[in-house]
Design a protein with these regions (language model features):
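C-terminal charged capping/lid subdomain of soluble metabolic enzymes
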Residues: 118, 136-142
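Alpha-helix C-terminal capping segments
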Residues: 56, 84-85, 105-113
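A short helix-loop
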Residues: 2-63, 140-142
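Glycine-rich phosphate-binding loops at beta-strand->alpha-helix junctions
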Residues: 90-109
């Protein structure tokens, strides 16, 4: 979320920047193949911020920068899930938090892994994801 907001501010978008950055990214026709910086299931996105600065200085289109950032976040999330699966097996997935209200990321993660997502309107708060998880757990106990 921090990367998305920082990028949005650099692009002149109003904070919080998630929805506006998503709309901007949808205007891009560029496709990025990103190799995330991973250590186990942990990722670092600081290099992405540096790349954003370089792309801004190079005059890249704002829509392409927005798409680059969301592609980077998607690659990191996919890398995290793959690392968890490699260590623990195919666990059920629950995606929650503000970033999960992004339809681009939701679609890519759902296509790759399935999982449970709260409706976008409820994804802006981690508490909604925790509530969904609690409901799923209570159904399993019945």
């Amino acid at each position: 979320g921090q990367l998305i907001d920082r990028t949005g501010v650099r692009l002149g978008l109003q904070f919080p920047c998630g929805p506006a950055l998503e709309q901007l990214a949808l205007q891009s026709r560029v496709s990025y193949k990103i190799k995330p910086s991973m250590q186990g299931a942990n990722c670092s996105l600081s290099g992405v911020e540096n790349q954003v600065d370089k792309r801004l200085q190079a005059g890249d289109a704002p829509a392409d920068i927005a798409r680059f950032v969301l592609s980077s976040v998607s690659a990191a999330l996919k890398g995290m899930v793959q690392a968890v699966f490699a260590e623990y097996g195919q666990l059920p997935l629950l995606f929650a938090g503000g970033v999960m209200s992004n339809t681009i990321l939701r679609q890519e993660l759902e296509t790759a892994f399935g999982g449970v997502f709260a409706p976008p309107a409820l994804s802006c708060d981690n508490a909604a994801g925790v509530a969904v998880y609690a409901a799923l757990c209570s159904k399993e106990l019945e």
